[in-house]
């Protein structure tokens, strides 16, 4: 993949880099591959969130790097930089990797590391579980794993060492880091983890044993969404929800703090 971007005074920045195709609603994302020139001059859309901003086509990341290798010849791995993949906060219902406070240019230039900030699906689009084997939730966490996969496959071209990735985040990002530590899908994809707050960012929210099961999460998060979309009695609830107006899904479930279930990261 080739990208068109720009540099600031002390680092290069690649904005709005697609790491996954537009995801199927309530389906798991896969890494994006392309040999076409991709513009990386502006941030990609944030993920759909209240009050109705953003898009479901939102799986973009941003790369800030102090060093770009010459990719026309074999890359000197000794010159590659350590990588921080930063996961934004926002209670799993808001925020994006393009929020100004997550701009990684200063850290890249002063810390001599590559900084990656990511979007991931939020609210019901990222975490709504159905109490069946078809749609088990945690699509937002799966997006984070997909971002890790993309970074591992491509970050050398941006000056980063795929074998030296640290995952980090604050608030919901810190919860994500803890969840990824317990996710089999993320094993071996990073070398260090740095949760930068407690589980909620503001106060103690209990132990990891308090993460709900899929059944508990479905009862709390899914019931109001099914009711609002008239999908409660559908033969296939997931198909019904996929056809529903995204704004209706958002308004029904977008303010409910998703209950991340470690169990559902195992599907």
State the predicted function of each range:
Residues 192, 205, 240-267:
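Substrate-gating cap/lid region and adjacent catalytic-acid/histidine neighborhood
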Residues 20, 228-229, 244:
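Phosphate/oxyanion-binding loops and surfaces in catalytic or ligand/nucleic-acid-binding neighborhoods
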Residues 16, 50-234:
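Serine-hydrolase-like catalytic core of hydrolytic proteins
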Residues 234-240:
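Flexible, acidic loop-helix segments that line cofactor/substrate-binding pockets
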Residues 1-79, 261:
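Catalytic-loop region of hydrolases
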Residues 14-15, 21-32, 37, 92-94, ...:
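Aromatic-residue hotspot detector
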């Amino acid at each position: 993949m080739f990208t068109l971007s720009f540099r600031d005074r002390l680092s290069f920045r690649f904005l709005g880099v697609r790491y996954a195709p537009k995801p199927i609603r309530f389906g798991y994302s896969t890494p994006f591959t392309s040999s076409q020139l991709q513009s990386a001059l502006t941030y990609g859309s944030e993920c759909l969130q209240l009050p109705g901003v953003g898009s479901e086509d939102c799986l973009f990341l941003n790369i800030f790097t102090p060093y770009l290798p010459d990719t026309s010849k074999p890359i000197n791995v000794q010159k590659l930089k350590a990588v921080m993949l930063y996961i934004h906060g926002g209670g799993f219902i808001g925020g994006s990797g393009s929020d100004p406070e997550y701009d990684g240019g200063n850290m890249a230039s002063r810390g001599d590391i590559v900084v990656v900030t990511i979007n991931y699906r939020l609210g019901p689009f990222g975490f709504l579980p159905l109490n069946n084997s078809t749609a088990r939730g945690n699509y937002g966490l799966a997006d984070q794993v997909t971002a890790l996969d993309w970074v591992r496959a491509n970050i050398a071209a941006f000056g980063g060492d795929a074998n030296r990735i640290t995952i980090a985040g604050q608030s919901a990002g810190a919860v994500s880091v803890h969840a990824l530590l317990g996710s089999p899908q993320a094993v071996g994809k990073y070398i260090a983890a740095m949760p930068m707050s407690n589980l909620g960012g503001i106060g103690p929210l209990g132990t990891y044993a308090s993460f709900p099961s899929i059944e508990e999460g479905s009862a709390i998060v899914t019931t109001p969404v099914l009711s609002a979309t008239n999908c409660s009695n559908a033969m296939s609830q997931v198909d019904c929800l996929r056809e529903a107006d995204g704004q209706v899904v958002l308004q029904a479930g977008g303010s409910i703090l998703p209950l991340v279930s470690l169990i559902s990261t195992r599907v």
